């Protein structure tokens, strides 16, 4: 670069720093080492691997959408439990007014430490979310759900009144404000969304999500969660077989998917995933109905092995670590804003 260009650039940089503060513009040279991406585990080993970075990225917006009763809220509560386990502070903006503390506690959520808001309007919900993010004291915020973020004008109006595009404009404005603060405070914000059907679509999928297109653009990760079957023991239904597809991913290659079981009253079957993925990666050996680890038999049949892993959490954690290392996933989970940390997985 010529001397004249260098002087002009130096003057411009000095003016920018004078106007907007030091660090407003930086050169990505050797002194500015790229930091490891911090993540919060989803509570599902398979999904952590599918995301490519070991969990949901902090400082980003994540959208989780799917049909009714597909496990959207369960997945979010599992992630909240994982965040709290590492000392993180979490908030749950319950726009649907359907939060169940008993169920959340069963999933490992420390309900007494969870900040819960049940706002009256969409504007109030998003303003609360923005204030929490800007505080810098929250590690994870869940908004459940976008479809329930009803604009104030619609609530105060009469039934049948037309309010075309109000919710989409509300989301667009809120996300413009939120994005910068989310990055600066390194907060993970998860929006749960519902599916609607587009009328008159002849080709392609007729499904769409609520709240307009803004959330699709601002989200770094979009997860499509579906129930694919039921888990039965005789005639009794014990849970759901679930598939999650990574529709969009700005931090790793997209279009991967994970399959896991969600058991009623327990949540995601982490031990079941350890068995399936462990066998696939040759960490757990399967011979007929028998499973063995490090040359020792650990049970006959998947259900018995799952119980054994629950009773031996240190072995389960060891298998988990081996699977992550084999797949090149290092857990860059930092401690939250609280001082205490707990290295054990919450009991189910």
UniProtKB/Swiss-Prot annotation:
Keywords: ATP-binding, Cytoplasm, DNA damage, DNA recombination, DNA repair, DNA-binding, Nucleotide-binding, SOS response. SUPFAM superfamilies: P-loop containing nucleoside triphosphate hydrolases, RecA protein, C-terminal domain. It is found in: Cytoplasm. It comes from the Bacteria. One of its GO terms (cellular component) is cytosol. ATP binds at residues 66-73. GO terms for molecular function: ATP binding; ATP hydrolysis activity; ATP-dependent DNA damage sensor activity; damaged DNA binding; single-stranded DNA binding. GO terms for biological process: DNA recombination; DNA repair; SOS response. PROSITE patterns: RECA_1 (PS00321), RECA_2 (PS50162), RECA_3 (PS50163). Its main location: cytoplasm. PANTHER family: MITOCHONDRIAL DNA REPAIR PROTEIN RECA HOMOLOG-RELATED, RECA. Can catalyze the hydrolysis of ATP in the presence of single-stranded DNA, the ATP-dependent uptake of single-stranded DNA by duplex DNA, and the ATP-dependent hybridization of homologous single-stranded DNAs. It interacts with LexA causing its activation and leading to its autocatalytic cleavage. Belongs to the RecA family. This is Protein RecA. The lineage of its organism: Bacteria, Pseudomonadati, Pseudomonadota, Betaproteobacteria, Neisseriales. The gene is recA.
């Amino acid at each position: 670069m010529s001397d004249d260009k260098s002087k002009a650039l130096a003057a411009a940089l000095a003016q920018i720093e004078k106007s907007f503060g030091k660090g407003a513009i930086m050169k990505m040279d050797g002194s500015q080492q790229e930091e490891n991406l911090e993540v919060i585990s989803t509570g599902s080993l398979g999904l952590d691997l599918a995301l490519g970075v070991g969990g949901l990225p902090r400082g980003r917006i994540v959208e989780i959408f799917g049909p009714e009763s597909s496990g959207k809220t369960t997945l979010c509560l599992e992630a909240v439990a994982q965040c709290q386990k590492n000392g993180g502070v979490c908030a749950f903006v319950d726009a649907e007014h359907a939060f169940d503390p008993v169920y959340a506690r069963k999933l490992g959520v420390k309900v007494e430490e969870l900040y819960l808001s049940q706002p009256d309007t969409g504007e109030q919900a998003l303003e609360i979310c923005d204030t929490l993010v800007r505080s810098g004291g929250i590690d994870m915020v869940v908004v459940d759900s976008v479809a329930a973020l009803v604009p104030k004008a619609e609530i105060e109006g009469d039934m049948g009144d037309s309010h075309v595009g109000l919710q989409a404009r509300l989301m667009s404005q809120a996300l413009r404000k939120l994005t910068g603060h989310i990055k600066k405070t390194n907060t993970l914000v998860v929006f749960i969304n519902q599916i609607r059907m587009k009328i008159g679509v002849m080709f392609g999928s007729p499904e769409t999500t609520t709240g307009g297109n803004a959330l699709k653009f601002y989200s770094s990760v979009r997860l499509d969660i579906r129930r694919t079957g039921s888990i039965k023991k005789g005639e009794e239904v014990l849970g759901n077989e679930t598939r999650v597809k990574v529709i969009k991913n700005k931090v790793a290659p997209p279009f991967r998917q994970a399959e896991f079981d969600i058991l009623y009253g327990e949540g995601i079957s982490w031990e079941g995933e350890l068995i399936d993925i462990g066998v696939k990666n040759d960490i757990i050996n399967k011979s007929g109905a028998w499973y063995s680890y490090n040359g020792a038999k650990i049970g006959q049949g998947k259900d018995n092995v799952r119980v054994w892993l629950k009773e031996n959490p240190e072995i389960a954690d060891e298998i988990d670590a081996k699977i992550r290392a084999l797949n090149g996933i290092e857990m860059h989970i930092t401690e939250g804003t609280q001082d205490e940390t707990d290295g054990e997985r919450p009991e189910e």
